[in-house]
Amino acid sequence: MERLTRLNHFLVNMRWDFYEGVIQAGYIRNLQRELDHTPAELLGSKLDLIFFRESLNLSTYVNNWYMQNLGVPGPVNFIEKYHDACFSNYMKLMEIPSPLDQFEIVPLIPMHIGNFYFSFTNSSLFMLLTLSFFLLLIHFVTKKGGGNLVPNAWQSLVELLYDFVLNLVKEQIGGLSGNVKQMFFPCILVTFLFLLFCNLQGMIPYSFTVTSHFLITLALSFSIFIGITIVGFQRHGLHFFSFLLPAGVPLPLAPFLVLLELISYCFRALSLGIRLFANMMAGHSLVKILSGFAWTMLCMNDIFYFIGALGPLFIVLALTGLELGVAILQAYVFTILICIYLNDAINLH
C-alpha cells in the first residue's frame, strides 16, 4: 500500500516521487551527465525535453508496476489524458518559434487618430531605409561633379542598372518613339530598384523582408496596373475595350470570350502581387527552418549530431545563394511583366 500511495501521489502532483523507487541511481547520473554537456543557452529547452521524454515513458513504468504489484494493466484512460496534458505543457514551455515569426509586423511608434489606428512599423522602417539607400546612391552618383570619368564600383553599379532597365523598356514596349518611351522609364526604373533592394535587404540577418507581405505586393501591383489601364484609355479612349474581343471571333462565342478576357485582365494584377509575395515568403521560410535545424544539431555536444548537421548546413548555404538569385529574378520578372502589360495597353495586343 505504501508504494501504491507513492504512485498515487506522483499521479496527482506530477512529481518525480514514483521514480525514486523505480529508476536506478545510474540512470539519474546519466541524465545529469546529459545536462552537464548541454550549452547554457539550451539548458532550459533540454530540461523541458527530458521532462517530456520521461513523461512519455511513464506509461511503461506504471504498467510494469501495476502488473508486478496488482496483476492488472495500468489505467489506460488516465495515461492517455496524462500524455495529452504533458504534450500540451511541453509545447507551452518550449515555445517553439515558428518560421513565420520573421514576417511579423511589429509597431514601433503606435499612433491613434480618433477611431483609426496608425503606427510606424518595422515594415515602414525598412521600406524607408530601402528608398533612402538607393535614392542617396543615385543622388551622389548623378549630382554635378559626382560622376567620375573612370567610374568607381558604385557608379558602375548604378550605370549597369540604368542601362539594364532602359534596354528592357526599349525592347518590350513597341509602337512608341524613343522620347515617348522615356516617359515610362523613370517609373519602371524606380519600381525595379525598389523591389531589388527590398528583396536583397531581406537577406540581411535580423532585417525585415518587405516583399514577403501580400498586402504590400498587392498594393504595388494594383497601383501600377491601374496606371497602365489609365494609359490605355488615354491612348485609345473607349476603343481600349476592343482588346477584350479578339478579331474573327464567332458572334455566339463573343459574350463568353469577353467575360473570360476581362477576368484574365483583372487577374494580371493579382498574379503579379502573389508571385512576388509567394516566392519571397516560401524561400525565407525554408531557409529559416533548415538553418534552425542545423544550428540545433551543431549545438549538441555529440559527434554524431555535429556530422548530421553538416548536410543541413550545406543545404542552408546553397539555399541562401538560391534566395539571392530569386531576389534578383523576382524583381526582374515583376519589371518585365509591367513592360509587357504596358505594351499590351499601348498596342492593344
From Swiss-Prot:
GO terms for biological process: proton motive force-driven ATP synthesis. The chain crosses the membrane at residues 118-138, 184-204, 213-233, 240-260, 280-300, 303-323, 326-346. The keyword ATP-binding does not apply. Gene3D superfamilies: ATP synthase, F0 complex, subunit A. One of its GO terms (molecular function) is proton transmembrane transporter activity. One of its GO terms (cellular component) is proton-transporting ATP synthase complex. Residues 1-97 form a propeptide. Disulfide bonds: none annotated. Its main location: mitochondrion. It is a multi-pass membrane protein. It is found in: Mitochondrion inner membrane. The atp6 gene is located on the border of one of the mitochondrial DNA repeats resulting in two identical copies of the mature protein with different propeptide extensions. Mitochondrial membrane ATP synthase (F(1)F(0) ATP synthase or Complex V) produces ATP from ADP in the presence of a proton gradient across the membrane which is generated by electron transport complexes of the respiratory chain. F-type ATPases consist of two structural domains, F(1) - containing the extramembraneous catalytic core and F(0) - containing the membrane proton channel, linked together by a central stalk and a peripheral stalk. During catalysis, ATP synthesis in the catalytic domain of F(1) is coupled via a rotary mechanism of the central stalk subunits to proton translocation. F-type ATPases have 2 components, CF(1) - the catalytic core - and CF(0) - the membrane proton channel. CF(1) has five subunits: alpha(3), beta(3), gamma(1), delta(1), epsilon(1). CF(0) has three main subunits: a, b and c. HAMAP family: ATP_synth_a_bact. Belongs to the ATPase A chain family. This is ATP synthase subunit a-2. It comes from Arabidopsis thaliana.
